[in-house]
Design a protein with these regions (language model features):
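Alpha-helical transmembrane segments and their immediate juxtamembrane cytosolic regions
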Residues: 1-396
Length: 396
């Protein structure tokens, strides 16, 4: 294996980009109302790409780079200890995702009970929702992609991983072509497989398509592997006596080159294979990984080369505890929508109070919806900043 570039300082831009994506995911998942959202803050209905469609895949790209960094301590050799650690983390992340889904159902049924039922029945209906919990989701996809990437990285020669990525994406494209995979309905092969294995009760409801479904996990794994390969390209093969500035400039050139090639390839191939987040199409992988690589290069230049880092503290608070902050955002969102207090002759949730009573009269429906999302991100940041200030890093 070639000599790895060694530095006495971590690349801050990685934490910042990770923090930007976590803050972005929290923001787009928590508008004041889904009925009034500015267009850039909506996901593409089917084919196409919006700024909102970038936050999750960029985070997954960074996760691939982080996986490379974290596995270096094992010298990329599989061992019983490494395998157990990877398995435990994969299961933990997956179960946390399931737990958030259960907690959401519990709060919904507890605060909206069937009229006329007893306390015991209400409690049972709220607790026992396992027959209708969504099995897959964002955290579950992260878990599966991390686990697969880590095992591949420890058991396969790294020079062969690009061929594996190409095979996965090409095979998935053929599957989409042969299985009506570009149709936005339940005749899509992705929908058929999910409904057969997961059953509709455990799926996201979107024209029969689960955006984090089983088959679309295949290109998502390729996505994280691409991030892993970029991490390897960045951090291996440098000169032992190379100074930090030269190393960072080398990063910039590599990242911009890779970013340009991937982005151009993704857009060019989109004429035959549409860019589509909900099915995680191969062109979606190429385009978003390319843009992520370019974003990272830009941030390295701004933060690590030029030293303009004062503005980045806000995002660093999210970036050093990324998964915890994402989980926190999900839990707080559920609580804000569930916890009610007396207001006039009825009761009102925290979410409704902040949006309809405080913000909507000032900013209007759409502006107030954005203001609520920003306020919610700010509330999460207050907690994240306290952890950051105390150097408390919660690893998930």
């Amino acid at each position: 294996m070639s000599n790895a570039v060694k530095t006495n300082k971590r690349i801050l831009a990685l934490d910042i980009l990770r923090g930007v994506t976590i803050a972005g995911m929290i923001m787009v998942n928590n508008p004041g109302t889904w009925a009034h959202i500015y267009a850039p803050l909506r996901h593409a209905e089917w084919n196409g790409l919006t700024p909102t469609d970038l936050v999750f895949p960029v985070f997954m790209f960074i996760m691939g780079i982080s996986t490379y960094i974290s596995l270096k301590k094992y010298n990329f050799e599989f061992s019983h200890a490494a395998g157990i650690k990877i398995l435990k983390r994969t299961i933990l992340i997956f179960l946390i995702g399931m737990a958030i889904g259960w907690f959401s159902k519990f709060c919904y049924y507890w605060t909206s009970p069937t009229e006329g039922i007893s306390f015991g029945t209400q409690l049972w209906e709220s607790v026992w929702t396992f027959d209708r919990i969504r099995i897959l989701g964002v955290m579950q996809r992260l878990a599966l992609c991390y686990g697969a990437t880590a095992i591949i990285a420890l058991t396969m020669k790294h020079k062969n991983i690009p061929y594996l990525i190409a095979t996965l994406l090409t095979g998935y494209f053929i599957l989409l072509l042969c299985g009506n995979g570009f149709a936005y309905n339940d005749t899509n092969i992705l929908s058929i497989v999910d409904r057969t294995i997961l059953t509709p009760a455990h799926m996201y409801k979107d024209n029969g398509i689960d955006p984090e479904g089983l088959l679309s996990t295949i290109p998502a794994i390729a996505h994280v592997l691409l991030g892993f390969c970029v991490g390897r390209m960045m951090l291996e093969g440098g000169k032992a006596n190379e100074d930090r500035e030269s190393m960072l400039n080398s990063h910039l050139i590599k990242l911009f080159l890779v970013g340009t090639i991937l982005t151009f390839s993704g857009f060019l191939l989109s004429y035959g294979c549409p860019i589509n987040k909900k099915i995680w199409s191969p062109t979606f992988v190429l385009t978003t990984c390319g843009l992520a690589s370019s974003f990272l290069a830009l941030l390295i230049w701004i933060i690590d080369v030029k030293g303009y880092k004062k503005w980045s503290l806000f995002f660093e608070s999210f970036g050093v505890n990324p998964l915890f902050m994402y989980v926190l955002g999900g839990v707080l969102s559920i609580l804000f929508g569930s916890i009610c207090f007396p207001w006039g002759e009825s009761s009102i949730s925290i979410h409704t109070f902040l949006y309809k009573i405080l913000l909507m009269p000032i900013f209007g429906e759409t502006g107030g919806s954005l203001a609520y999302a920003l306020l919610f991100v700010g509330i999460n940041w207050c907690i994240g900043y306290q952890l950051y200030k105390r150097k408390i890093y919660i690893k998930i």
